[in-house]
């Protein structure tokens, strides 16, 4: 049986600034695992470290073998990330952006993956020749997820895909994420909408100040008084302006 993603004692940061300290985390194969936490907790830093975008220490394995720190080698192992900034090509069409995600595939397989992406995202199919830069934020987010799927990832990492979206679009996007999971893709989801993320996940981790403070079955955490109290506290911190610096979420 595949071992999925296993993280032990992960340390990461930016230069002399340490953001993550001793992170232990698992994303079992075939499961949808969510990581939540307040602003500045280190959630985005976690995904950047796992994607090889910043140096990391500790042990990270995928399917039982060490995960390299080189982004290209990580992609070749079957991992894909959708960053918070989407990183689309605004002057290229929806179809062209999607096809870039499958540039390593043979032409026939790339066409099949494109058709599959349009099945998941019918709105993209309707706008396949529209320029990405003219789309709404929600449509661009769907395009970013669709492009990541083009490479046939075995593990899909999503960095706050619902950030800045209207509630209806959040529901639509997370429903698609759940469909992708049901299609057999292992997912590690970093999400700022705690209740909605826990509602679609199997496992969950709560990160605060660069450390895992809670973990368990998502349903159990969803009903946890401790989690609700922690997030009430996190909201107060953000409102009073004493939260950690942005960019290390």
Map each language-model feature to its residues.
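Glycine-rich phosphate-binding loops of nucleotide-dependent enzymes
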Residues: 2-249
């Amino acid at each position: 049986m595949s071992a999925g993603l296993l993280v032990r004692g992960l340390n990461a940061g930016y230069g002399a600034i340490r953001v993550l300290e001793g992170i232990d985390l698992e994303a079992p194969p075939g499961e949808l695992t969510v990581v939540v936490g307040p602003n500045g907790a280190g959630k985005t830093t976690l995904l950047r470290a796992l994607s090889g975008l910043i140096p990391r220490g500790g042990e990270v394995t995928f399917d039982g073998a060490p995960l390299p720190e080189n982004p290209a080698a990580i992609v070749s192992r079957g991992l894909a990330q959708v960053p918070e900034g989407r990183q689309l090509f605004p002057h290229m069409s929806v179809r062209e952006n999607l096809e870039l995600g499958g540039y390593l595939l043979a032409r026939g397989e790339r066409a099949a993956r494109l058709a599959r992406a349009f099945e998941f995202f019918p709105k993209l199919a309707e706008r396949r020749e529209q320029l990405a830069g003219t789309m709404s934020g929600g449509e661009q987010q769907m395009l970013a997820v669709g492009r990541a799927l083009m490479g046939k990832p075995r593990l899909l990492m999503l960095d706050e895909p619902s950030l800045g979206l209207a509630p209806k679009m959040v529901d639509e996007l997370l429903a698609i994420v759940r469909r992708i999971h049901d299609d057999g893709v292992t997912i590690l989801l970093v999400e700022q909408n705690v209740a909605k993320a826990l509602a679609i996940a199997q496992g969950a981790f709560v990160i605060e100040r660069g450390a895992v403070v809670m973990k368990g079955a998502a349903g159990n955490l969803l009903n946890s008084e401790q989690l609700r109290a922690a997030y009430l506290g996190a909201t107060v911190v953000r409102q009073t302006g004493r939260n950690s610096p942005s960019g290390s979420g």
